[in-house]
Amino acid sequence: MCIPVGVYVASQGGPQRIVCLTEEPTEILYLLGEEHRIVGITVYTVRPPEARERHPMVSAFIDGSVRKICELEPDLIIGFSDIQADLAAKLIKANQQVLIFNQRTIEEILEVILTIGRIVAAEERAQHLVDGYRSAIEVAKERANKIEYRPKVYFEEWDEPAFSAIRWVSELIEIAGGEDVFSEKSHGKLAAEREVQWSDVVDMNPDVILASWCGKPVNVESMRNRPGWDSITAVRNNRIHEIDPSIILQPGPASLTDGLRAVSYTHLTLPTNSR
């Protein structure tokens, strides 16, 4: 984080003019009933859909218009990860208050919700949301524990080069009853640490392949035609599934709800000939 959270907790009612450089804080503020504080969002915001109509879009994911953001006179700007470090630095040089989260696990996602709740004086509502997500996760775990067979799952975040699941996605796979074949790679902080070769996937021979290419549609046919992939169980059994990036690659409420449901739906039931 670039600023201490306590700065805003101590102020009356918290910040009143918030710019969200990524979708997650926007969705969180809406769920907290604090959307009236939002004055700017990213062009990639799709949750909730009404946000695009209500707030000006002032940033992409990596960069944004410092001038437009400053013209909104924000008292807090919220962003995500080292990918937005350059934009954050520009905004700080422009005397803006910037808060950068870097949540990579489900627990960290929940902590972000609680932190934003504290910042906008909506702690009780934030705790209620988090309790609900924890309950849903426990239900998913209990359901998964009843499954005799835990399918091996390969999640592909990008195709060339291929990147396997980031940490929270790997955790969702495990919660839903699957076994992430590259779970160790998910602990890497950098995307490069999750790079895999197509031959590595062949060696792992997953039962299910989940694909969510950040920024473009998944080409299932091209995946099928990769060298050696015709021997993979998931390919032979037509178990390649695309998941919308907006519900799985956003480290916020979307992943804990629609993302978890999508992962559960695509691999909880396997054809008997895949075992």
Map each language-model feature to its residues.
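Single conserved hydrophobic/aromatic residue that forms the stacking wall/gate
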Residues: H267-R275
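N-terminal ligand-binding lobe of clamshell/alpha-beta domains
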Residues: M1-L268
